[in-house]
Amino acid sequence: MALTLLRGMRTPVVARRNAGLFFTTLQSPLLSRFTMRAESARAAAPKSIQLATKEAAEQKAQGFEAVIGIETHVQLSTVTKAFCSCPYSYGSQPNSTVCPTCMGHPGTLPVLNAKVVECAVRLGLALNCEIAMTSKFDRKQYFYPDLPKGYQISQFDIPIAKEGYLDLDLPVEFGGGHRRFGVTRVHMEEDAGKLLHSESGSYSQVDLNRAGVPLLEIVSEPDMRTGIEAAEYGAELQRLVRYLGVSNGNMQEGSLRCDVNVSVRPIGQSNFGTKVEIKNMNSFSAISRAIDYEISRQILLHKEGQADQIVQETRLWDESSQKTFTMRKKEGLADYRYFPEPDLPEVVLTSEYIDEIQNSMPELPEAKRRRFENMGLSMQDVLFLANDDNVARFFDSTLEHGADAKLAANWIMGDIAAYLKNEKLSIDEIKLTPLELSELIASIRNGTISGKIGKEILIELIAKGGTVKSVIEEKDLVQIADPAAIEAMVDQVLADNPKQLEQYRSGKTKLQGFFAGQVMKASKGKANPVLLNKILGEKLKANS
């Protein structure tokens, strides 16, 4: 078993069984080389290039521009792996969802999961790509302990989709505006296993549960110029795969992983600079900060006449120090010795198959944003509502029940969003229905209840469910709209507060708010606020 898991490995390995599961342990020589290389890189980092992330934008303004591209790996939410029938579930016991095929045993043959092809075509269409009617698989060969076959099944020269683009809208706080970033290609491949490192750093264990899990790699054009643009591109891609249902897109689980290529060049120069790949970024915020730091590092080397120190390499982002460090020299395509996968036939598609997928596509984030924008909503509202497909569906359903778009957006973005944040819930986990939100909005607009009472009812509906009508009747919350009743309460409040009334007459007109509050308190929040302010104003004017 150990020889199969790590065949071709020249460093001693130890295999052991624990609770019925195999663990393969990588002894210290190879691991030590990796660790020593990273530590030496940290120690050797020149003091002059250890810049704070916030300086990146200032450095960029000094005659240079960044050129940024992203390679994104999306783990597909299929029932089984790409080339075998093993299931995969994040967090499973190590080496519990493996078989001879995904473990790379000699003589085993891969069988393509048709769902992987469907997901690839679906994402390719969503990215406005040209879909290849015929594509093929290739072997990408390299050595690493978590790659038991010694190669990865991928696609090289004929990907399933190419030459597309992704549209997005930048948030106002990042400058706003529309952006379009090119997509070079989308291709299918399998994932590798995972190394589990010991706390002491003296050994690593190999978990092959992830080996063979289907991935789609999306390669962007080098169209981005800032860390913010790159982070927003990644966030939009995450949004897209979630809308499509092809992946959960969770970065924390490794379902969406972004490797960034960064280079800088003098403004006006057409040739690209030497690109550096950055890995180990587990959030979109980290992507932005890592890129900004790397831009600063490269620009400073240029300005100090040390541009030759920028080499094609892979660097790791270190969250604690907020810096990038050398991991390894970057391989070229020739190093992988690609050649066609002999055990898999070509993937041949038909126009009918592609049309069927196209016709089943949901409304995508870009189209949804444009539709919401046409309702007269601000871009801030649009971005919030379209960010999560569940929120967007809740909003749409509320409108279908007759609610005003702006009022519905305000409730969802305000009180409902605050509740979800505090309780750490998603909108599909609460008991409030779109119908009842629509009824709540209508009850406030027609004067049945006040806005203040509406907020109280909302919390009850979110937590316990029920209907607006039943809560109003049960708690006697119908708004008081009888002028005589409100006038009587105003008279009583003015009579009970002679000192404040005298101060009002002396010019402290802000006390009108105090009197209004006392009336609302007396009415238990049920007094019609418009009618209350009208009657109170008339009474105060008469008493002046």
UniProtKB/Swiss-Prot annotation:
SMART domains: GatB_Yqey (SM00845). InterPro entries: Asn/Gln-tRNA_amidoTrfase_suB/E, Asn/Gln-tRNA_Trfase_suB/E_cat, Asn/Gln_amidotransferase, Asn/Gln_tRNA_amidoTrase-B-like, GatB, GatB_C_1, GatB_Yqey_C_2, Gln-tRNA_amidoTrfase_suB_CS. It comes from the Eukaryota. One of its GO terms (biological process) is glutaminyl-tRNAGln biosynthesis via transamidation. GO terms for cellular component: chloroplast; glutamyl-tRNA(Gln) amidotransferase complex; mitochondrion. It catalyses: L-glutamyl-tRNA(Gln) + L-glutamine + ATP + H2O = L-glutaminyl-tRNA(Gln) + L-glutamate + ADP + phosphate + H(+). It is found in: Mitochondrion; Plastid, Chloroplast. Its main location: mitochondrion. The keyword Chloroplast applies. The keyword Metal-binding does not apply. Keywords: ATP-binding, Chloroplast, Ligase, Mitochondrion, Nucleotide-binding, Plastid, Protein biosynthesis. One of its GO terms (molecular function) is ATP binding. Its EC number is 6.3.5.-. Allows the formation of correctly charged Gln-tRNA(Gln) through the transamidation of misacylated Glu-tRNA(Gln) in chloroplasts and mitochondria. The reaction takes place in the presence of glutamine and ATP through an activated gamma-phospho-Glu-tRNA(Gln). This protein may be expected to contain an N-terminal transit peptide but none has been predicted. Subunit of the heterotrimeric GatCAB amidotransferase (AdT) complex, composed of A, B and C subunits. Belongs to the GatB/GatE family. GatB subfamily. This is Glutamyl-tRNA(Gln) amidotransferase subunit B, chloroplastic/mitochondrial. It comes from Oryza sativa subsp. japonica (Rice).
